C-alpha cells in the first residue's frame, strides 16, 4: 500500500510541471509513513484490504464498471464492522495528510514567488497596493481609506467542523515538521531524525481518536475558537497593520507616519449566538467574555515578560526620555542588577500592573472590588492606560537612536493592544425575532394587562414600540412574574451590559436579529436593549442593532423595510448615535435552502443594490455583513472573488463576513495561511472600494437575463424540493441526515423542531448531508433547467449572450466558477449508491433520475458558457487537487452506504454507528468545504 496507494498521484501528475514535484514528494512520504503505520499497528490483512478497495473503487468511479460495483459490494458486505472501522480510519487519515501536504505546498509556492521577485499575485496586499499606485492613488487617499475601513472576519461555531482539537494539534505538528524539512538543509543524521519525528507524529495521529466521545458544549466551542488567536490572530493582525504602515511610510518619504487605526477586527459568534441554541445562557456569555479576556491578558503578560529580557539597554550607554525615567522609577523593582537598565525597570512595573489588573478582574468576577495589589501596583483601568505606558517606551527608543528596537516586539504589542484591548474578540449577540417578540409581549402584558401585543398588526406594534422607546420608564420589574424565556433573554442582555461596563463597548458591539422581516423586529430588540441600559430613551445606543434577512422573500423586502425604518425618528436617533452607520446582515444559507443556488445569489445581489439606494437616500453609511458558509451551497467559495463580485457601492471600505466550520481551521490554523487569508479580505475590500471605477456596471440586458434565469431556476428548485411528493422521504433515506444528529460536532440542534419537514431543517445540516452523498445538490440544482429555457427562447444567440455575461460580469463569472468547483466534487456514480438506500423503488427511480438529468444539464450548460471541454479546465490546480482525492474519498462513501444499510436494518451495533460517524469525518476532510 505504501507506494501503490499514492501511485495514482504520480500517474495523474505525469508530465506535470516541476514546481509540483515537492507536493508529490510530500504526499508519497506521508502515504508511505501512514502505510507503514497501518501495517505495523493493524497487520498485513488490513493493509492489503485498503489497497484492494481503493483499486476497485477507482474502476467503478472512472469506468462506471458494473463488475467493479458488484466486486466492491461483495468486499464491503463481507467486512465486519470492526474491520470497516480500521479501513475507514486509513482512508480518512489519507485525506487529512493530503490536506496537510497541499497546504504546505501552497505556502511553498507563495514563498517561491516572493523569493523569485515575481509580480505580486491577486489577493495579496502587494498586488492591491500596486494596483492602487498604478491607478494614481497616493498615500493620503490610502490613509483616508484605512481611517474609515472595517474588515472583520467573524468566527462562528456552526457544526461543520468535525475534527477534534487533539487531531488538529497533531496535524499542525506534522505540518510544522514538513515545513522544517523544506527549509532545513539537513545532514544525513538530521534527515533521519526528521523522518523519525514525522513517524512519531503520524503514529500519534493514528492512535488519537478522530471523534469526540461527548457532544461539544458551547464553552468547548469557545475554547476551540480561542485556539486561532494563539495560532494566528494575536501575531498576524498586528503584523499586517505594521506592514501597511511601512508601505505608507515608504510612499511618504521614509519617515514613520501616523499609525493606522485597528481596522482589521476579528469577531465571534461563539458564546453569543442564541438562535436555536438553548445552551447559550447568561452564564455561558459571562464565561465566554471571561475566557476571551483571560487569554489576551495572558498574551500581554507573556509579551511584556519577553520585552523585559530583550530591552536590556543601560542608561550609561544610551539616553532615555524623562517620561521613561519617571516610569522606571515607579516600577518598584529594587533589584541592583536592574538599577542601570531603565527600560527593564519600566517593563517590570508594567508587568506588575498587568498582574494587578488580572487580579482585579478576577476579583470583580467574584463580585469583589480591589484596589492596589499587595506590592502597591495599581491595576490598569483600561487597555488605553496600558497602551500609554508602552507608548512611553516607544517614544523614548525612537527619540534616542533605537528606532529598530522600537519597531520590533514593542511595536507589535502596541498594535495588538489597539486591536484586541482587554477583551480580545468583539462578540456578537444573535437571537431569533420570534423570541424577541414573545419577550416584548410578556413584558408589555405584565406591565399593562390587556395589551395583547401578539394580536396587534404590524402598524399597531410599531406605534406601541415607538412610544416605549422614548419612555424613560422601564417595563421590567423585579416584582412581576415572567416566563422562563423572558427571564433568560433579559439575563443575557444584562450580562452584555455588565461586560460593557467592565471592558468597554467593543466587547459586545453588535446584536443581530435573525429571521428579520419587518420594522417591529428591529424596534423590539431596541426596546429590550433599553431595558438593560444599552439603549437610552433619549436616542443613544451603545450597541449596533442589526437585521439578518435570510429568506428569498425577506431579501426582496429588505429595501422597503430599511427605507421605512430609517425614516422613523426614534430609530434614526439610534443610528446617528452610532456614527450614522447601520449594518445589515444577509443570509446566504437559508436563502439557498429556500430558493436554490441561482436564485439565492441573484436575490442577494439585488438586495444589496436596493439597500445601497435606500441608504444613499437617507445619508446613512451602509455596512454589509455576509453570512456565508463553507460550501458553495451556503455562499462559500473564494472570498477574494466574492467580494470583488459585489455590486458597486456595496463594500465602501467596510465588510464583515462569517468564517464557518471547517473553513476556520483550513484558513487560520497555520499563521502563514492565516496571514494570507487576512490579506485576501483586506485586499479585496481595498480594491472593490478604491478601484471601483474599473468595475463597469453590468449592462441592463445582463440584469434582465439574470432575473429570467433566477425565476426559472427558482421554479425548478422549489418544484423538486418542496413540491415533489415523497421528496422528504427520499432525502431522509438517501443521505446521512439522521446520523449527523448523533455526531458530536456542535452544541446546536440540527433542526429547529422535531419534524422531518425540509422547512424546519437548518441550512447547515441540509447542505452537509448533500455533500456527504456527493450530490452537492444545493450548489447547482435548477441551473441547467434555467439555461436550457433561456437558450430555447433564443436559439440563435442565447449561448453567445451568456458567454458575454460570463466574460464581462464578475458576479455571473463568480457564480459559475463556484458551480464549476461544486460539480467537479460531485459524483453521480457514488450518489447512485446512496439512492439504493431509498426503500421505495418507484420513489428512488423517479427522484434520482430527475436529479441525474438536471446534473447532466447543469454540466452541459456550464461548459458551453465557460467555453470549457471539461469541468475545472480553467483551474488545473484545483482540478488536480480534487481528482487526487477521489481514490481515497470514494471508498469512504461506499463503506458509508454499507454501514447505513446495516444501521437502518436494526442489525447495526455501536461499531456500525461509530463507523458511520468516522466516514462522515473522513468525507468532510476529503471535500474540505462540505458544510
Swiss-Prot record:
Alphabetical UniProt keywords: Carbon dioxide fixation, Lyase, Magnesium
Role summary: Forms oxaloacetate, a four-carbon dicarboxylic acid source for the tricarboxylic acid cycle.
Q: What is this protein called?
A: Phosphoenolpyruvate carboxylase
Q: Its catalytic activity? A: oxaloacetate + phosphate = phosphoenolpyruvate + hydrogencarbonate
Highest lineage ranks of the organism? Answer: Bacteria, Pseudomonadati, Pseudomonadota, Alphaproteobacteria, Hyphomicrobiales
Picking any one GO molecular function of the record gives: magnesium ion binding
Species this protein is from: Azorhizobium caulinodans (strain ATCC 43989 / DSM 5975 / JCM 20966 / LMG 6465 / NBRC 14845 / NCIMB 13405 / ORS 571)
Q: Which GO terms describe its biological process?
A: carbon fixation; oxaloacetate metabolic process; tricarboxylic acid cycle
- Matches recorded under Pfam families: PEPcase
Q: What is its EC number?
A: 4.1.1.31
Q: Extract one GO cellular component term from the record.
A: cytosol
Query: Which PROSITE patterns does this one have?
Result: PEPCASE_1, PEPCASE_2
InterPro entries given in the database record: PEP_COase (IPR021135), PEP_COase_bac/pln-type (IPR022805), PEP_COase_Lys_AS (IPR018129), PEPCASE_His_AS (IPR033129), Pyrv/PenolPyrv_kinase-like_dom (IPR015813)
